[in-house]
């Protein structure tokens, strides 16, 4: 016999992205504050000797409980097809060192499921970074959606685990980790293609790059010479040229080649004021 029933749409079965109640749970001022304080979402987490192992759930306990109750109430009355799942497409961590490159130490960062007592990495979603490798960007991609359930006394969800190894003699902060992600909640779940954890080493920022340009160097030195205010020492019958312009122009600094057809007045373009690290 052919199926005679009706099929509810995805919204009715509630991936619940458009539900006002769920929006209030996820984006209330209290929920946003807890995401920052309990989960370090978008905040810098300092790795210190007294905090050698850090476990950061991707959903605060209070928020987890409210979301689970929302789905359970809908499930109990037959409006939802499950008690809810948590989906995280990607977790991105920016890692920077706060000690010298000579410091011998490393970080082990991985994604875990709080439903696992051993807190083992999910599908090999684990990256190790030596101190001299930093800075770096790390990414994780779970291969399944996590049920919104309680296991023992633990609210089950994904978590970022960071372990600090080595750094003998360094008791303060040796590295800073800033993690970002976007958790989604639905009454339906799926499995996903396995993608290995990503590790991208980043070139350190060259904050002196602007000062290495010839025109910038000349401008900087000229401004410094012109701003010097000191006592004047005069020799008998000798006039002192107090204009520092001639001194700065004698520096062995090559100006950029002039454009074809430009007039001699265009030579001053090479010495236009430029911003050099805020100067």
Swiss-Prot record:
Compartments (UniProt record): Host cell junction, Host plasmodesma
Record's keyword annotation contains Nucleotide-binding: no
Disordered: annotated span: 247-279
Keywords noted in UniProt: Host cell junction, Transport, Viral movement protein
A Gene Ontology BP annotation from the UniProt entry: transport of virus in host, cell to cell
Keyword Transport carried by entry: yes
The family this protein is said to belong to: Belongs to the cucumovirus movement protein family.
Protein function: Transports viral genome to neighboring plant cells directly through plasmosdesmata, without any budding. The movement protein allows efficient cell to cell propagation, by bypassing the host cell wall barrier. Acts by forming a tubular structure at the host plasmodesmata, enlarging it enough to allow free passage of virion capsids.
The protein's name: Movement protein
């Amino acid at each position: 016999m052919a199926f005679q029933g009706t099929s509810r749409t995805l919204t009715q079965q509630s991936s619940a992205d458009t539900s006002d109640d769920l929006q209030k749970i996820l984006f209330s001022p209290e929920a946003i504050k807890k995401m920052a304080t309990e989960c370090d979402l978008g905040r810098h987490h300092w790795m210190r000797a007294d905090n050698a192992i850090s476990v950061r759930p991707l959903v605060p306990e209070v928020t987890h409980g409210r979301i689970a109750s929302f789905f359970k109430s809908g499930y109990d009355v037959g409006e939802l097809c499950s008690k809810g799942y948590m989906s995280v497409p990607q977790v991105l961590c920016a890692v920077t060192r706060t000690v010298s490159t000579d410091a011998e130490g490393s970080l082990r960062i991985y994604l875990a499921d709080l439903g696992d007592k051993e807190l083992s990495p999910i599908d090999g979603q684990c990256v190790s970074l030596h101190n001299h490798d930093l800075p770096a960007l790390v990414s994780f991609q779970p291969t399944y959606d996590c049920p919104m359930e309680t296991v023992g006394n633990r609210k089950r969800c994904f978590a970022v685990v960071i372990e600090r190894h080595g750094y003998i003699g360094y008791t303060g902060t040796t590295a800073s980790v800033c993690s970002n992600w976007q958790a989604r909640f639905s009454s339906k779940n799926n499995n996903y293609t396995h993608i290995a954890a990503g590790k991208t080493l980043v070139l350190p920022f060259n904050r002196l790059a602007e000062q290495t340009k010839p025109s910038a160097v000349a401008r900087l030195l000229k401004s410094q010479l012109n701003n010097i205010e000191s006592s004047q020492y005069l020799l008998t019958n000798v006039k002192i040229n107090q204009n520092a312009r001639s001194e700065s122009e004698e520096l062995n600094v090559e100006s950029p080649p002039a454009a074809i057809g430009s007039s001699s007045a265009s030579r001053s373009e090479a010495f236009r004021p430029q911003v050099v690290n805020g100067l």
